[in-house]
């Protein structure tokens, strides 16, 4: 209603495919069109490696869910992983073949439509982000997702949702910004300064700043 866009994360499996959820999604698509983007976690374009991560009989169900979303005109994105050491070019080619076969409206060469996540190993040392990084990398702090976006999560069993800086930090309580977007805009102290996020987490350096990744749709 205010001109914002929303990126909804899902595995597109049975919970999303319930009639009540499908009906709600169709209503949201009708109201918001392409400003609503559904990003589906498909760890690998092939069944074997996807199910190595997600478990047996998960691949077909996810494909079925993406097929439904594509058939009903949703703006789509895919989240894959680079865990197996396959090159980015090979991964994008593989997802591209799958998208063409299924008729999914996804440009696999667009890093926002096919996000390939590196492994987030917190035991690995990463360089600290300094002000000099922005000049060296020819980047601006405003380009990082948490400069202009927030993630809202309703955890199982929780009474209220929680606002977080981004999709990479769903479980770290130090990065919880409040229960509403208004509270998040005022978050101060710890990892925040008047609603702004301090880039102190290892994922900030490895993926967003030095890695050049983006979760934004």
Task: Show where each model-derived region lies.
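Short, conserved loop/helix-junction motifs that constitute active-site signature segments
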Residues: 26-33, 69-73
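Canonical radical SAM enzyme core domain
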Residues: 1-31, 38, 42-64, 83-90
């Amino acid at each position: 209603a205010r001109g914002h866009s929303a990126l909804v994360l899902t595995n597109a499996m049975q919970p999303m495919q319930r009639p009540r959820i499908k009906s709600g999604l169709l209503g949201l698509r009708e109201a918001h069109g392409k400003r609503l983007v559904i990003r589906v976690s498909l760890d690998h374009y092939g069944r074997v490696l996807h199910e190595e991560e997600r478990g047996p009989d998960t691949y077909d169900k996810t494909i079925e869910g993406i097929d439904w979303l594509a058939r009903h005109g949703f703006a789509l994105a895919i989240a894959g992983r680079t865990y197996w050491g396959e090159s980015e070019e090979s991964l994008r080619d593989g997802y591209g073949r799958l998208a063409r076969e299924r008729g999914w409206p996804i440009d696999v060469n667009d890093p926002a439509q096919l996000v390939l996540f590196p492994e987030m190993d917190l035991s690995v040392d990463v360089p600290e982000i300094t002000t000099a990084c922005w000049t060296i990398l020819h980047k601006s702090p405003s380009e990082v997702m948490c400069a202009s976006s927030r993630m809202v999560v309703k955890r199982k069993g929780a009474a209220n949702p929680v606002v977080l800086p981004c999709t990479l930090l769903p479980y770290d309580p130090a990065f919880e910004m409040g229960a509403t977007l208004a509270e998040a805009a005022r978050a101060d102290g710890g990892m925040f300064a008047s609603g702004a996020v301090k880039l102190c987490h290892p994922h900030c350096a490895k993926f967003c700043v030095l890695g050049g990744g983006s979760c934004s749709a």
